[in-house]
């Protein structure tokens, strides 16, 4: 919604890196602010997931089943199939729904930044670490952490994540003492993780820990019967936002889609 700060030509990393860290911290803090409980439940419940096709309803049924447990969940499917929507619904219909739901896309960060974002760091632990920083695991304590595109995570960080799953502990960058955490992990990927394991890019032990309960989300091309329902819902939502009267969608337009 605007500029956070600015840099000038010639600024070095000693200024740029802390500035980026502060901007990311503010964005993340804004992202975990609590919404009104009623609004949150309506927006993120399974009832908000639109579709009537058999593959989608089967995925929803599985997700409802696992929501009442506390086991890790692995969501698989192509980009755009709604993996984060499912993760939010699982969280908000679980016993952890009073805690935070925090999410991160593992493909959006370098290994070093991703480690800092997830596990946090102590001041002075590396260049630009001017103050202590909470990691997402700390933010998600007693709640749920969603690790999107887990297949992009560096193999070194996979070992730290495995430790959390095995012991409920992690070590911040710059610390030697482990921190205990009570958090549910939901991961998602658009990759074929068994193939990544064979290629040496993903840990087999981590895969089995994450995939205690695995749900595959079908792409829209495999559920064409949902196209009209989704289109009408999007048109209705846009009409309300633009304060227009409700619009209808022609059969010819749906057939084209």
Locate the predicted segments by residue:
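Loop/turn-to-beta-strand initiation segments
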Residues: 141-144, 160, 181-186, 203
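Conserved RecA-like P-loop NTPase ATPase core
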Residues: 36, 59, 81, 104, ...
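Conserved post-Walker A coupling segment in P-loop NTPases
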Residues: 11, 48, 62-127, 138-154, ...
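Nucleotide-binding/hydrolysis machinery
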Residues: 18, 27-28, 94-99, 174-184, ...
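Conserved two-component signaling phosphotransfer/partner-docking surface
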Residues: 8-17, 22, 111, 115, ...
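Flexible nucleotide-interacting loop at or near the entrance of a catalytic core
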Residues: 9-78
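Receiver (REC) domain switch/active-site region of two-component response regulators
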Residues: 12, 21, 55, 105, ...
